[in-house]
A protein has these predicted regions:
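Generic alpha-helix signal with a bias toward terminal, lower-confidence helices
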Residues: 226, 273, 313-315
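Compact beta-sheet-dominated globular domain cores
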Residues: 279-321
Length: 321
């Protein structure tokens, strides 16, 4: 589905940086939400940026959109990720470092093109990012009722206490995948051996964007200061979700999400022989995270095809020790 605009022939796609909206309901500038994100160590290694794009987005052409996003000069100027040494850099800089062993002359050519004061600020003469690896993230939930069961008597042992359905039930602390698991909520979210809670949420529910946001805030970063109550996690997850996702009511008054969400993990570079592995002939990949394959690594592109806005929310897990 594409947005209902008449300039579908506009090409190529360009991105324009948008300012942050007013604090309310923007979770990433709201004082209360930010204080919790900082407490949970989800701000230091995170970035959020908003852009408007010129060419209509079509769900059947997400490959091109995601690639264009990471290859845009404007995006690379305003949105950075962490490299292998945990330094903030543009995707293009990281790709150029990775490709420096292949063709230094082409790298210099690209650098000259970027330095050209007459060049289009949205485009490059030679694409650096040829492809991006991503997955579509289901996003259909329009209420927080999904988490009501965390307060029910159904799960045993309970997630929250009897008589105080907001207070999390504590347990003997255990280390699982680098996380300190000291309550039944965190055990439910990450312990694969927790048979008591494995059916509390279906795999479909766990795949929903709202559930992923809730899990991210509940697990936090490497220096997370955990909560003893459930409501802060719910409140911040709701605020973040509303900041990234938009819903519209149909003719029957039923709300439906119009935002498409994509989770990116790495980008590929190289045309012809440049940037290809000499053995396999495949394009080389560069991770968007310093330590790949951690569940708290995420780079979500939230696309609103009606407004032609894309918001990127990025976080990289960086161990403290």
């Amino acid at each position: 589905m594409s947005a209902p605009h008449g300039d579908a022939a506009v090409a190529p796609r360009a991105f324009i940086k948008l300012p942050d909206p007013p604090s309310s309901p923007w979770a990433f500038t709201d004082a209360s939400s930010r204080s919790f994100l900082r407490k949970w160590d989800l701000e230091k290694h995170a970035r959020v940026a908003r852009f408007r794009y010129t060419k209509p987005f079509h769900r059947m052409d997400a490959d091109e959109f995601v690639r264009d996003f990471f290859d845009s000069d404007v995006v690379n100027e305003h949105f950075h990720v962490l490299d292998r040494t945990a330094r903030w850099r543009s995707v293009r800089e990281i790709v150029r470092d990775a490709s420096s062993r292949d063709e230094p002359d082409e790298r210099a050519t690209n650098a000259d093109a970027d330095a050209d004061p007459d060049a289009d600020p949205n485009l490059t003469k030679n694409k650096i990012v040829e492809k991006a690896s991503y997955a579509k993230t289901p996003c259909a939930v329009t209420s927080m009722s999904l988490f009501d069961r965390l307060r029910d008597d159904t799960p045993h042992p309970r997630i929250t206490r009897v008589g105080d359905c907001d207070c999390l039930v504590r347990k003997i602390e255990d280390q699982i995948d680098g996380f300190a698991v000291a309550d039944n909520l965190r055990s439910c979210l990450i312990d694969a051996c927790d048979e008591n809670h494995e059916t509390l949420f279906s795999e479909t529910e766990k795949g929903e964007f709202l559930f992923k946001i809730f899990s991210h805030v509940a697990l936090g970063g490497s220096m997370c200061q955990y909560e003893e109550r459930l409501s802060p996690y719910e409140d911040v997850a709701k605020a973040v979700y509303k900041s990234l996702v938009r819903a519209k009511k149909d003719e029957n008054g039923i709300a439906a999400v119009v935002t498409d969400v994509y989770s990116a993990t790495e980008v590929f570079f190289g045309t012809g022989t440049t940037g290809h592995d000499a053995t396999t002939g495949k394009k080389k990949a560069v991770s968007l995270f310093p330590r790949p394959n951690h569940r708290q690594n995420f780079c979500y592109l939230c696309v609103d095809p009606w407004r032609r806005h894309v918001t990127v929310w990025y976080h990289a897990h960086v161990p403290h020790w």
